[in-house]
Amino acid sequence: MTHMFEGVGVALATPFTNNEVDFDALERHVQFLLDNNIQAIIVNGTTAESPTLTDEEKEKVLATVVKLVNHNVPVIAGTGTNNTYKSIQASIRAKEIGADAVMLITPYYNKTNQRGLIQHFETIANEVKLPVILYNVPSRTNMTIEPETVEILSHNPYIVALKDATNDFEYFDEVKQRINANEFALYSGNDDNVVKFYQRGGNGVISVIANVIPQEFQYLYDNRQNETDITNYFKPIEKLLEALSLDVNPIPIKVLTAYLGYGHYEVRLPLVPLEEAQCKQVERAFEQFKAGEQ
């Protein structure tokens, strides 16, 4: 079995202009990513500000991306919620629109136990019959998919991958020991750990920063066998990532998507923009990176 993708998937930011989704900017941004050879596009996830998108907006964003991508790379829709049956409905609709897979976050707020997680994910997968990427991000959900749970879920034919945003390599190593690496992919959900993630056998990344430096991030994957090369190549990227850590994602990355002309610098409440001085700091870090300064 081949994996859903190998290399860089981009967690797509949603451009806004006057608090409305800017579909012209969205199309230009997606074309930029395709022109730079990214391997997958993930829509309606955390970086997309999905909690503040309406169902209609999510569907229209997905339809726009699916049409533009035209089967050249997988389009993966974030459809997971803390309500199993709403997740099923959203996933079925994504399938109808043309998504190649869905990404399901662990239930948040109401949470559950590991037995509940298994039933939650398998109920969705078996009903929707579309490839599923599990999304483990305990920093946002206060809920972890334990390694033994990943192992159980990996036997479901529709559950094909894990996006691991734990930044915990003991967790990663245990998961990797428990799964069939030929059939189940492991993607990093943390841009700052990709070098180490690749060195330990990860299959790729679902990246935020690749919204603006897709080619550079794909280079890291393409040259992952050369540890010295990618370690050195990554050093200036680390400096840019430091600037993007000024606030919660996607607040800082949208400074740069706007800087590149993909919509205005807008986020929806409860998110608020960076202060002007912080915006300048992020832009300056990006300019220095592009100029090759370290």
Curated annotation (Swiss-Prot):
Its main location: cytoplasm. One of its GO terms (cellular component) is cytosol. Pathway: Amino-acid biosynthesis; L-lysine biosynthesis via DAP pathway; (S)-tetrahydrodipicolinate from L-aspartate: step 3/4. Pfam families: DHDPS (PF00701). Pyruvate binds at T47, I206. The active site is at Y135 (proton donor/acceptor), K163 (schiff-base intermediate with substrate). This is 4-hydroxy-tetrahydrodipicolinate synthase. It comes from Staphylococcus epidermidis (strain ATCC 35984 / DSM 28319 / BCRC 17069 / CCUG 31568 / BM 3577 / RP62A). The gene is dapA.
